[in-house]
């Protein structure tokens, strides 16, 4: 496999840009884990987004090894596997016994058992382009499932007419990332890379539109509280696709803390902690 596709300049340009954005997205949880290390507790954070992000990066890395001239796809997902492993290790070190056991079970079931099963079946039952298509299909299917994660927060924004729990900067970054990786997939004529990012772009654009529409809306605090209860948002982590990493996106964990203050879209009544998982399919895709 050639390191760079010298015959496709646009693929190289978009792949390089995608790597830069995705590297930044992968590193976004660093302040969160610095806080965990400093306080020696995981507080209300969950490990699921990071376990899912690692699994997604592993799948896309395996897919990349079956293709030619996709070195930039290898680099971003290799980094994703590395950084997510560090995040999970820190989480396990400082988590409660219950959270630690849950994380270990998820790793054994998904990242070890699930990935090994896919690896063995694809290696022994499929060859050449057929194997790449099967792995690509699995990556796309997993990415689409992860992309459904932000739908609950979108529903809450529409019903409460409040964007307090949907940071615009995060939505903008992930949308740009999805566009870059979409263009990369189109430049390579790779439907498996391009398709998940079409969904990522649509959802990202929808979030930004909702932000603009409801930015200046005033919503009674009791309505916001009611909708948050219905959506089960308080004190939990919401997995948002990290579109910028072909791990499909890696999900991003956002911990929402309710406030008793009056809700005004221009006044923050909640502390939002951004963490990673993503995210993501990668990542991006």
Swiss-Prot record:
InterPro entries: SWEET (IPR047664), SWEET_rpt (IPR004316). Expressed in leaves, especially in phloem. Expressed in developing seeds. Residues 1-9, 65-70, 127-133, 189-192 are extracellular. One of its GO terms (cellular component) is plasma membrane. Its main location: membrane. Induction: Induced by the powdery mildew fungus G.cichoracearum and the pathogenic bacteria P.syringae pv. tomato. The keyword Ribonucleoprotein does not apply. GO terms for molecular function: sucrose transmembrane transporter activity; sugar transmembrane transporter activity. Keywords: Cell membrane, Developmental protein, Membrane, Repeat, Sugar transport, Transmembrane, Transmembrane helix, Transport. The chain crosses the membrane at residues 10-30, 44-64, 71-91, 106-126, 134-154, 168-188, 193-213. It is a multi-pass membrane protein. PANTHER family: BIDIRECTIONAL SUGAR TRANSPORTER SWEET12 (PTHR10791:SF244), RAG1-ACTIVATING PROTEIN 1 (PTHR10791). Mediates both low-affinity uptake and efflux of sugar across the plasma membrane. Involved in phloem loading by mediating export from parenchyma cells feeding H(+)-coupled import into the sieve element/companion cell complex, thus contributing to the sucrose migration from sites of synthesis in the mesophyll to the phloem. Contributes to seed filling by triggering sucrose efflux involved in the transfer of sugars from seed coat to embryos. Belongs to the SWEET sugar transporter family. Forms homooligomers and heterooligomers with SWEET5, SWEET11 and SWEET17. This is Bidirectional sugar transporter SWEET12. It comes from Arabidopsis thaliana (Mouse-ear cress).
